[in-house]
Amino acid sequence: MSAEASPETGRFRTKSSPELFFPATDSEGEEQNDVPLTIVHPTQSTSSKFSINIASSSRPQHGITTGDFETTSQTSAHDDVDDDFSIVGHNPASSHPQGTIVAPRRKRSLQQAHSHHSSSSSSPVPSAPVIRADFRKGFLGEFVCEGWSLSKGRGYCSPGTKIVIERPKSKSTDVGAPKPGRKDSGPVRLVNGKVVGGVKSKQMTLGSMMAKKVEPAKKVKATTDQIIRFRNERGFEIGRLSIHEAGFLTHLLDTGVIQLSGNVIDCPQNLTTGCTILLNIKVYLARKAFENFGKHKREEHFSFWKDQRETAMEEAMRLRKDSLRSLFERIGVKPIQSSALSKVTPIQGVLNRQKGPDLEGSRLRSSPSTSTAEEKGKGRAAMRAVDDDEEDSGDEAEKLDEKQMNEIDSIYRKAQQGDTRLDEMDPPSTFLYTLRPYQKQALTWMNAREKGDSSVRNESLHPLWEEYLFKKDQLPGEPIEISDDDEQPDSTRKFYWNPYSGELSLKFPTSQNLSRGGILADAMGMGKTCMMASLIHTNREEKPAGNLESQTRDGVEGEIDEEPASKRIKFKQVTLSNQWRAVPTAPKVESFPRATLVVCPVSLAAQWHDELRKMSQQGSINSYVWYGGDRVDIEALLAGDGKERVDVIVTSYGTLTSEYQKWLRTKDRPNYEGGSLYDHEFLRIVLDEAHNIRNRLAMVSKACYELKGQRRWALTGTPIVNRLEDLYSLLHFLRITPWGNYSFFRSFVTVPFLNQDHKALNVVQYILESCLLRREKTMRDKDGRLIVDLPPKTVEIKVLQFSRAERQIYKFLEERAKKRFIELDADGRAMSNYTSILAMLMKLRQCVDHPLLVLGKSGEDGELGEKILESGAGNGEGNLRDMIAMYAGGIRAETPDDVDKAYAAKVLKELGEQEDTPICELCSNEMFDEVLLPCYHRSCQDCIVEWIGTCEDQNKIASCPSCGKGPIKLADLRSVQRRHKRVNPITDAYPGGRDPNSKSSNDTTVTLGKVDLVTSTKLRALLRQLEEIRQEDPKAKALVFSQFTSFLDLIEATLTKQGIRWLRFDGTMSQAQRANTIEEFGRKTNEPLILLISLKAGGVGLNLTMANYVFLMDTWWNEAIEQQAIDRVHRLGQNKPVYVTRYIIKGTVEKRIMKIQRSKTALVNASLSNGAKTKETTLADIKKIFGMDEEDSEGEVY
């Protein structure tokens, strides 16, 4: 028989009755110090009013005074604290009604009870939460819910009965706990020189030491129940809350976030098991809810190489966030002030998307160790090294299509609305250039950003937080107070909630954006270098207000600054002279940072140096190119003074990456003495063409992240290339919180946008308005004038027709590639053989430029290309290699070689005496690439070759179109080569310096030779247009762009043969060679000059306004890259009309790529170029490129 108290009288009786307040099962199976069962009687000091708030797990700290919202009795100060469930705010000696039996309890010290609160967080919340000493709890609100009775009989409750709500203590099973058979002798301690205590184990022997170690057993986490019980004030259990209500309350009660109280609204007089009881529940936020939560170092749970599953801390954050959100919705709590972000983004949708273990976004697919079978099935190659020119920044599925890119453009326009109203600021007199009005406005904005006067007010609410108000807890019988809407709420009743992380705070979370810098994203050719140079002159060395760098880094991904190497204790080298002792030397006293570090592509390093020299008054700004063999000791470079002072250091992304890798290898060595870029803090860090760091996982990005600088700037015309996460990398570099935190950025920027949540655009706009300045050439100022007045630009697309031989080679190659693709697609193996398909597409694009390019190997795809070349052999059709060899060598001449001599002797005199340019009989235009027929008539090479091919297609004998003599074969044609002597301006100016018997400088030498059939259709079109330009403007300069350096080689040889002067600029050249090329191209000349330039190496950043003709020889995968190439010429400083010519071949992949660019994706695929073999293009796009789209029509213009 068990002794119990009657629910009516409190007297003991010997019969079964409801469970007691502390059930015996709570302490079963635990090793603990037992306390005898005692009957606690009420004392005089017992409060007449019982508080019915329940806290789980642990007690609050002692000594806390009366709270603002509820008066409670003092807790007694004793050393042992009850770790079971207790009533908050009551003396343990007086918290139980008379006759209640207190069950055994486990003792734990107060210090131990609260030791688990000292973790850290990566969320942008105040580092140390400020909780008022008198704060105990705040009334959040109340709601009505149902409960289920677990008791039978009368007297348990009635309408108005106050109830106490509690949770049964959770238990976890430790598989690795000591076995019951082993004796625990208490804590380990030292007694008489011997270690005693602890669980006894076997003695360690040599055999046991050599035996295989057994991994410790993992703790088995017990499943969390959702049972919340409620009892009356006399301690008798009445029932439990419904599962629907208990679902979101369970976690909050277990973690001590909330306290609950309530009363019965309605219930049956005679309770039965399972009957419904209507309850009114009051919810209070406890003091513990505002303590540090979720603060942890990122390194403790995130590793690129470790298992990327959700950690326990992340799970706790997610459960807390979801539970609080459900609670707020259940009570109907609304914020009194929403952040700017909350006003533009649907929090509900963002939070729903954050459910589950993907708190860190796409970490799973970022790990190389978690490659799936599906990825292997798609034929992805191994991860390649990321260089400066080409990087992958994420999954192909997250690329933005044309519609989404247009939405990004609209964001830019909205963010630019207020830019025309910026004030204008003049640079100091040491800056020699005159800024345009929009550049002066940019200087105003940049200066304000560096001074900390950003548009975001320091006292504005943090964009991730919302402001709420505690309600007034109305006691029963008190009149209901109606607050005035105009009345300012009491500041002590305010609290703040972060719906994205679940954190709560009593302190106002300000939007303290400590970043001093931003993104200058003006369109290409608007003078970003000039504007940054003016800023360097405006803001020189100054004393920093504090360690701003460390402050900003703390809020971004939990990173922690290491101690600079220059401040560490250094050691001299150990030698015999110092007797093998390491002698510490005092750290050097560093001056305030004064130098600006500019990181740019290697092709722009010399340009930065030259531009700074031209724009600066002599001696005001000294710059140094830190690259290659010129990398002197950085410490000595920064320590220079006077004439040796260096204000700007210019380096390349490749050099910085190399320095970063070296620093990682040596920085932790005990004898490391510094001397790296990463051991010094710079006044300003500038990333030119900053989209080079768009891949957050690339080594070049990490190298930029680690740089130390007080101010940070990113210069790029394309902050978002093709993914929203391109923007994240810039924000992370700039230390802009919270957007520089990847989990936050992905949670409510990337994922909502990809889910077509259009309100996510407003979030991006909100971000950009605070840190980005972007103007375009088409924008107008406040007076309606264009902010940039540039000469007109004319873009012409020349659609060319293949020659007969080229068409045969291309069709042969296309049919084989298409046949192979159809076979793979039919078998469902297209994507698993993706690399092979890309190799075939590459060969097609090369064949369009010149058939000889197909013979070359393209990196790792060369072997696949060889298979294509050999295809068709043995089936009577010949193979592709033989066809190209026939094309390159022409038809072998059947006439002997001595025919040339007699042939030439007869006509050379006549040709040399002619002064007028002859007219072609076939095209009725001036002859280009003049050839001589056996009948002495002449024609354009293209015209007569096409004429002969047409006759052969019609099974006719080719004859001369002028006289009808024939037959004519290609071997019978002779090329008329007229070479004009180059004019020497020095000797030509002084007739005495020339031999009077010599011929005039305008004399032309005429020779005959075999017809060169190696030139392609595009090459002939280029030469024809260059010849026209030479006739119109003898001093013209032009750029010829191609993505294939092998094609540039062929163009180079052809220009040399034609006597046209050229220069070369590509990725194989050193920085010094590139600088010399640009310098040579900029010099004045009296003859045409052509710059052959690689699209990848010279497509961005260069200032080539000395030219005004641009030729794009092939179609690039991204139209924006082509536009960047054009802007090398059409930019500030250009005073001539710009003419752009794009060559495409009708009926080829070029036409189809352009169609896809314009109509669908604007991003066919980077994998169509060399090296990008890990992308995924949709099958639909591949079919269109192969010409398998039914809508594809050859009748289109292109």
From Swiss-Prot:
Chain span(s) of sequence motif DEAH box: 688-691
Biased composition range(s): Polar residues: 59-76
EC code(s) of this entry: 3.6.4.-
GO BP annotations listed: DNA repair
Domain Helicase C-terminal, residue spans: 1021-1180
Cellular component annotations (GO), alphabetically ordered: cytoplasm; nucleus
Sequence ranges of Basic residues compositional bias: 104-117
Keywords annotated in UniProt: ATP-binding, Cytoplasm, DNA damage, DNA repair, DNA-binding, Helicase, Hydrolase, Metal-binding, Nucleotide-binding, Nucleus, Zinc, Zinc-finger
Residues reported in the UniProt entry to bind ATP: 522-529
Gene Ontology molecular function: ATP binding; ATP-dependent activity, acting on DNA; DNA binding; helicase activity; hydrolase activity, acting on acid anhydrides, in phosphorus-containing anhydrides; zinc ion binding
Stored Gene3D superfamilies: P-loop containing nucleotide triphosphate hydrolases, Tandem AAA-ATPase domain, Zinc/RING finger domain, C3HC4 (zinc finger)
Record's function text: Probable helicase, member of the UBC2/RAD6 epistasis group. Functions with DNA repair protein RAD18 in error-free postreplication DNA repair. Involved in the maintenance of wild-type rates of instability of simple repetitive sequences such as poly(GT) repeats. Seems to be involved in maintaining a balance which acts in favor of error-prone non-homologous joining during DNA double-strand breaks repairs.
Family: Belongs to the SNF2/RAD54 helicase family.
Name under which the protein is recorded: DNA repair protein RAD5
Gene source species: Cryptococcus neoformans var. neoformans serotype D (strain B-3501A) (Filobasidiella neoformans)
